[in-house]
Design a protein with these regions (language model features):
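Extended active-site and interfacial segments that coordinate phosphate-rich ligands
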Residues: 2-36, 149-150
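Cofactor-pocket helix-loop regions in the catalytic cores of large enzyme subunits
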Residues: 35-274
């Protein structure tokens, strides 16, 4: 195999084959790749055809107590196929209780009415992003790419004001002069998105949680009178408010999220905390 051409899908991955951005086909050409079903007979591997292999497998597991153990490393389709094969009662996700609780919480959030969960294409249209406790460059690289695109929206907006088309990359870059839509990253380690972030902070899971609640409180305060919203950075220049660094950061994040046309908060389960 020398080349793969993917059909364009504007609603899902566009030209990407994998939503995690990790598709590869190099293994297809490996000399040691299994291409033939084998059966071990008298300590020797004997080649068998696929129909015989399937029939023999069914015959051997029929009327026996079989369990299926899935894996978060396997694809959704593979886990689903295994679950169908062994039955709901005989299937394990391969997760421990804490990990399963996290997955259940994610499912609950995704299925809750009133909570907007944008697709990867939608993420690109947001103009302010807060990432809390999730290194998406490692857990969902396609989402990370969408965040990179979202960071360019301020430049596109500035270019549009001068009637410059967004696809003119160099003119848009010159007009923006480095301006980007605000992206805040709060994580337990530095991430590969730091280069596009307005602020990137390394903190403990406990402090990340505290900051998240403080941002929510500040947004609630701003919502009391949107007409009086003032950039916290401007206030800090005029007077020493005496507030701690976390509170000041929470105010700045809340301000940028409220001022944005389409703010977005991204989180995940990699810190194993609900």
């Amino acid at each position: 195999m020398r080349r793969i051409e993917n059909r364009y899908n504007g609603e899902v991955n566009r030209y990407f084959l994998c939503d995690r951005g990790r598709f590869g086909y190099g293994y297809v050409n490996r000399e040691d790749r299994p291409t033939q079903a084998l059966e071990r007979i008298n300590d020797k591997h004997v080649k068998i055809n696929i129909n015989y292999a399937l029939d023999e497998t069914i015959k051997r597991i029929k009327d026996k107590k079989i369990i299926g153990i899935g894996s978060p490393r396997a694809s959704l389709e593979t886990n689903f196929a295994l679950k169908n094969l062994v039955g709901f009662e005989n299937f394990s996700t391969g997760l421990n209780h804490q990990q399963q609780a996290l997955v259940n919480k994610c499912i609950e959030v995704l299925s809750t009415e009133g909570i907007y969960n944008p697709g990867m294409t939608d993420i690109e249209s947001h103009d302010a992003v807060l990432i809390l406790g999730e290194d998406i460059t490692q857990t969902s690289s396609r989402v990370a790419l969408s965040i990179r695109q979202a960071a360019k929206n301020e430049a596109i907006k500035m270019a549009a004001a001068t009637k410059t088309q967004s696809w003119l990359a160099e003119p848009v870059k010159r007009i923006a002069q480095g301006s980007q839509s605000p992206v805040y990253i709060i994580d337990v380690t530095q991430t590969k998105l730091e280069d596009i972030s307005k602020v990137s902070v390394v903190a403990t899971p406990e402090d990340i949680t505290k900051l998240g609640f403080k941002v929510a409180d500040e947004i609630a305060k701003f919502a009391d009178d949107l007409a009086k919203i003032v950039d916290p950075q401007t206030v800090e220049k005029d007077a020493d408010t005496g507030m701690d660094a976390m509170q000041a950061l929470a105010q700045q994040i809340a301000y940028d999220l409220i001022q944005a046309n389409k703010p977005l908060v991204v989180s995940g389960s990699s810190l194993s905390s609900i």
